[in-house]
Amino acid sequence: MKSALSVILGVAAVAFVAAPFTAFAGGSISGKVTFAGKSEQKEFSFAKFPNPKFCVKNPNKALMDGDKRFFKTIEVAKDGGLKGAVVAVVDVEDKAFTDAYAGTDVVAEFCEFLPFTGVVVNNKSFKVENHDADADDPKSVQGVLHNPHSFVVKGSSSATGFNIGLAKKGDKLDKPVVFRGGAEKEGFYRLQCDQHEFMQGFYLPVTNGYFAVAKEDGSFEIKGVPAGKHKVVAWHPFAAKGKKVEFDVDVTEGGTSTLKAEIK
């Protein structure tokens, strides 16, 4: 009897080991952000700003035409996909994520702030590094002067976060993002160079790591979202006048939920 029992337990153990084991860590949200409107841009003249002969060297030639520098506020693909929209789960507060967040990194490169859109975390670092120097200009050999100026924006009001000049290539700043009065829920963070007005960036505050920035065709994917029903927003600083559009998404363990996020 003892021998038979041992055999049964042995077979069960082998079966357990052989059985496939799948460990899920939430699900995914993927889809596309679309915009009902058209692409829009503002136009500047390089000649009206410092370093015109350097700024025109930006390798992204879609940003310029001769002396004209375009600030592309809204970029829409042929099928309506909206580039640069931020998609974020907003009903999860992940203290482990916010505590460990290393900060938002932005670079000034060929007179352009990159990335154009992204996220920030309240009371965490916002970093800007100057990558620009002009070997053809004796005054700018060591660096092209950029003056990153940040704003906390809530509705029609805005307040300065920092205003610091970065004179040399390699110069950096590291300042905390500070939202007050509910701006962390309703507002966003804006960056502009006081030397070159066409250098701007826009960043949505988040409280968890479940976010994505839409690609050129508007597509996005957010992985590892906890299973359950969630509130998800799609936001773009200029489309729909910067208003967040909210969606309900049901995420299943190990599954992928599709979201068609239209901004009108």
Language model regions located:
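Bacterial N-terminal signal peptides that target proteins for export
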Residues: 1-11
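C-terminal segment of classical bacterial N-terminal signal peptides
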Residues: 14-23
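Extracytoplasmic copper-binding redox domains, predominantly the cupredoxin/blue-copper superfamily
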Residues: 23-264
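Short stretches within intrinsically disordered, low-complexity N-terminal or propeptide regions
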Residues: 6, 14-15, 263
